[in-house]
């Protein structure tokens, strides 16, 4: 069973902010597959079937690892079957990349997951949000209309790539999607 986790912050004040791109990706998958996150456990919400779990932590970003670790332990999911989607300030807006492993790159959500799981060997799909002058204000800020239109388009491909990860090896998905975002 695969586990896809979109990172973000809970609450309406954070909806459609740059830091919630992971939540937006999960929402896009739900829309494409006509499913909803109807289960609640371990301070998060998720959809589950025999092939995959699609999830959002309801903790704040820097506590995402607690939810991910609890879900993985409860459903006996190995780290090899986890993929995390989140924002990346080092990528230009409208760009995305799939990686098999890596450091946190300063992102507190993936940093907490790496610490809780005690490994950097976590598959991830990073979505570019660009960089602003003040990092905290920038990531917690909402997209401009022009940037939102770019993000809305890329989320389609991001959702397709994540769904492809459920049924295909990550190297196949990387070859197919990296460079096409």
Swiss-Prot record:
Entry-linked PANTHER family: PEPTIDYL-TRNA HYDROLASE
UniProt keyword terms in alphabetical order: Cytoplasm, Hydrolase, RNA-binding, tRNA-binding
PROSITE patterns hit by this protein: PEPT_TRNA_HYDROL_1, PEPT_TRNA_HYDROL_2
GO cellular component, one term: cytoplasm
Organism: Metamycoplasma arthritidis (strain 158L3-1)
Gene that this polypeptide is encoded by: pth
Protein's GO biological process: protein quality control for misfolded or incompletely synthesized proteins; rescue of stalled ribosome
Active site: 19
Domain of life: Bacteria
Pfam families found in the cross-reference section: Pept_tRNA_hydro
Subcellular location: Cytoplasm
Name of this chain's protein: Peptidyl-tRNA hydrolase
Cross-referenced Gene3D superfamilies: Peptidyl-tRNA hydrolase
Site feature location: Discriminates between blocked and unblocked aminoacyl-tRNA: 9
Catalytic reaction list: an N-acyl-L-alpha-aminoacyl-tRNA + H2O = an N-acyl-L-amino acid + a tRNA + H(+)
Upper lineage: Bacteria, Bacillati, Mycoplasmatota, Mycoplasmoidales, Metamycoplasmataceae
Major localization listed first in the record, in broad terms: cytoplasm
């Amino acid at each position: 069973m695969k586990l896809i986790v979109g990172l973000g912050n809970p609450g309406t004040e954070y909806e459609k902010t740059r830091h919630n791109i992971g939540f937006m990706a999960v929402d896009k998958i739900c829309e494409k597959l006509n499913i909803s996150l109807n289960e609640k456990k371990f301070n998060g919400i998720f959809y589950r079937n025999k092939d995959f779990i699609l999830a959002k932590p309801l903790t704040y970003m820097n506590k995402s690892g607690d939810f991910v670790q609890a879900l993985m332990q409860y459903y006996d999911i190995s780290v090899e079957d986890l993929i995390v989607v989140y924002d990346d300030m080092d990528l230009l807006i409208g760009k995305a990349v799939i990686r098999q492993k890596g450091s946190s790159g300063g992102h507190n959500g993936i940093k907490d997951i790496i610490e809780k799981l005690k490994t950097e060997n976590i598959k991830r799909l990073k979505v570019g949000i660009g960089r602003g002058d003040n990092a905290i204000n920038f990531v917690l800020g909402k997209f401009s209309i022009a940037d939102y239109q770019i993000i809305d388009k890329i989320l389609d491909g991001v959702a397709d790539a994540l769904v492809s990860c459920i049924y295909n090896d990550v190297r196949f998905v990387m070859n197919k999607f990296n460079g096409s975002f």
